[in-house]
């Protein structure tokens, strides 16, 4: 389980990216790299990291489900994810 501060930091980054998205786009198109440098560091989408929606785990993230592999396995074994079952051939 990730620390609450790490989860909060990631949410704050998402909000900052959304806030400055239009301004970043305009500055990039104009080629104003000095203006881009003056924006906050967290305004860049490169600094965002995918995290599990339930546990906040940063590694082993499955984009299709929005959760980590560990959480996915637990939920799939308990039948909590519709349409997912253990492979057998």
From Swiss-Prot:
Alphabetized Gene3D superfamilies for the sequence: 30s Ribosomal Protein S14, Chain N
One GO biological process term: translation
Keywords: Ribonucleoprotein, Ribosomal protein, RNA-binding, rRNA-binding
Entry's Gene Ontology cellular component terms: cytoplasm; small ribosomal subunit
InterPro entries: Ribosomal_uS14, Ribosomal_uS14_bac/plastid, Ribosomal_uS14_CS, Ribosomal_uS14_sf
A Pfam family matched in the record: Ribosomal_S14
Keyword RNA-binding: yes
Subunit structure: Part of the 30S ribosomal subunit. Contacts proteins S3 and S10.
Described function: Binds 16S rRNA, required for the assembly of 30S particles and may also be responsible for determining the conformation of the 16S rRNA at the A site.
Protein name: Small ribosomal subunit protein uS14
């Amino acid at each position: 389980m990730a620390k609450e501060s790490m989860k909060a930091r990631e949410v704050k980054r998402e909000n900052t990216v959304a806030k400055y998205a239009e301004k970043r786009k305009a500055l990039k198109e104009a080629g104003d790299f000095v203006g881009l440098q003056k924006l906050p560091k967290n305004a860049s989408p490169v600094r965002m990291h995918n995290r599990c929606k339930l546990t906040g785990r940063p590694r082993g993230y499955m984009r299709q489900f929005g959760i980590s592999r560990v959480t996915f396995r637990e939920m799939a074994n308990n039948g909590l994810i519709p349409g997912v079952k253990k492979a057998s051939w």
